[in-house]
């Protein structure tokens, strides 16, 4: 019989995922064991394995939740109906806000990729799928400004975003965000122009 503290299965699953998300992001995936997740989520190991057959399944669920949150954030910005450049600015401000938030520990996907380097790893594949979605989203927005060189400009944006998120947990977040947002403005100006050369010129 399931204990009252575990609640309904959906509640137990939510507690497990919430606990894993908090610990994986703050301390690293490999650094956090199943026993600790079970203890802090206040469920049994049997309950965990009923919802997540293995730790990797829990890791994938964690990344899926982060992915869903970011897609929702992007969808909300796009749905506002602003010009494409302003939508990119809104996404950039949201990224900067995350970097400035307490407990920021970098990009969850880049962190996971560092812990799962094998190309055949399902976790690695989930990271790459998320990054491809993000690149495609930015490419589509930049193509609305100017079709030519939209994908190279999007790669520039993603690289700036990666750099800002990596540096944001090492140095002054305010300065990192200021630098990132200034770089985004420069990229938008260069991309909107014609025959001006690459964004780094």
Predicted regions and their residues:
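Hydrophobic alpha-helical connector segments
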Residues: 61, 75-103, 144, 154-157
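Short, basic, alpha-helical segments at the C-terminal edge of helix-turn-helix-like DNA-binding modules
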Residues: 64-70
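Amphipathic alpha-helical packing segments from all-alpha helical-bundle domains
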Residues: 71, 86-89, 119-144, 155, ...
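Cytochrome P450 catalytic-core helices
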Residues: 161
């Amino acid at each position: 019989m399931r204990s009252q503290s575990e609640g309904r299965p959906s509640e137990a699953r939510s507690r497990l995922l919430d606990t894993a998300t908090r610990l994986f992001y703050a301390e690293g995936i490999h650094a956090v064991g199943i026993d600790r997740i079970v203890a802090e989520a206040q469920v049994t190991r049997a309950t965990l394995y009923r919802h997540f057959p293995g730790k990797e399944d829990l890791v994938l669920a964690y990344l899926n939740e982060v992915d869903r949150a970011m897609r929702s954030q992007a969808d909300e910005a796009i749905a506002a109906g602003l010009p494409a450049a302003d939508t990119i600015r809104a996404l950039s401000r949201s990224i900067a806000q995350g970097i400035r938030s307490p407990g920021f520990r970098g990009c969850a996907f880049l962190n996971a990729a560092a812990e799962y380097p094998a190309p055949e790893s399902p976790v690695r594949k989930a990271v790459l799928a998320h990054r491809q979605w993000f690149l495609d989203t930015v490419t589509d927005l930049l193509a609305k400004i100017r079709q030519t060189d939209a994908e190279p400009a999007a790669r520039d944006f993603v690289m700036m975003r990666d750099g800002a998120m990596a540096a944001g947990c090492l140095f002054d977040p305010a300065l990192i965000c200021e630098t990132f947002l200034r770089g985004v403005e420069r990229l938008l100006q260069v991309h909107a122009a014609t025959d001006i050369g690459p964004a780094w010129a």
